[in-house]
Amino acid sequence: MKKNNGSKLKIIPLGGLEQIGMNITVFEYEDSIIVVDCGLAFPEDDMLGIDLVIPDVTYLKENIDKVKGFVITHGHEDHIGALPYILKEVNVPVYATKLTIGLIENKLKEHNLLRTTKRKIIKHGQSINLGAFRIEFIKTNHSIADAAALAIYSPAGIIVHTGDFKVDYTPVFGDVIDLQRFAEIGKKGVLALMCDSTNAERPGFTMSERTVGKTIDGLFAEHQNSRIIIATFASNVDRVQQIINSAYKYGRKVVIEGRSMVNIISIAQELGYINIPENTLIDVEQMKNYTGEQLVLITTGSQGESMAALSRMAAHLHKKISILPGDTVIFSSHPIPGNEKAVSNVINELSAPVSYTHLRAHETGRN
């Protein structure tokens, strides 16, 4: 994309196109580069011995003097997971919203990068200047709180990067997507739109997250005489909030199990993105003081990950929790494309009734 003076705006995807995961896109104008997102992907079945897949950032290393920063749209692994690895080679500031920065800082701490990495919290509606670019953060909704779209102003024109999004007029936490701002930017004239297309080929529309909350509540009412185990994405803080709400309503204690689940819920609670009523949360060790119908376990493993808590429970490898006769297991997420077999394997190992409740996290096409 050329400006009249001959300078070019380059948009270089280093991952995330025509694949699930590893989202990272480079925007370059003259001597300025910004990088939107820095995610990882999970290995395919034939990638034996590989735990994670991270993007090839040779281009960034070769042009390190131009790189002004990473701008992150939200806190899912496929958008932030590669940061601790890439920052060791491309050490530039990171800009994101409050919860996203909190999740990033947790990763940086694990990799001893907190002191060497500059971070800045950006609010929705706020703009930052990085070299030739001005980047505006726009409020969107997604299956994780604090998601943002980006309006990237360059000398060549405006690029709108939606990030992952859905339109939810009744979100569990925070404001609705700022469609008015999208309209205002559209009137200015947009050079390019880079839009989330996951599920776009499906007819209909994505329901509000609160719809799943009603379904969860119904399952709690239906299974009042059994222990409930719910597997979901650790990052879906709104979903966890609704599970906790139902647990509190039906007088159940909540156990959070799985390392990533414990970490994310702790961060979200500390930053005010989740509200847990007093005396609702208990440790695994305290479970012995309650009967099954007094408990609900929120766990990782909704994607069939072999080392996740639910997978270890199903295989009788978990040190503290086993699936018991009479338990009800709820999968509150949809398998990511490619994970269907792993999820099926876990379900086959469960000796408990299984229920499904999920909601597409991305906007769909409309009739």
Feature map (PLM): residue ranges:
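Catalytic metal-binding core of the metallo-beta-lactamase
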Residues: 295-355, 359
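His/Asp/Glu-rich metal-coordinating catalytic cores
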Residues: 2-71, 76-289, 308-322, 338-345
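Single conserved hydrophobic/aromatic residue that forms the stacking wall/gate
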Residues: 358-367
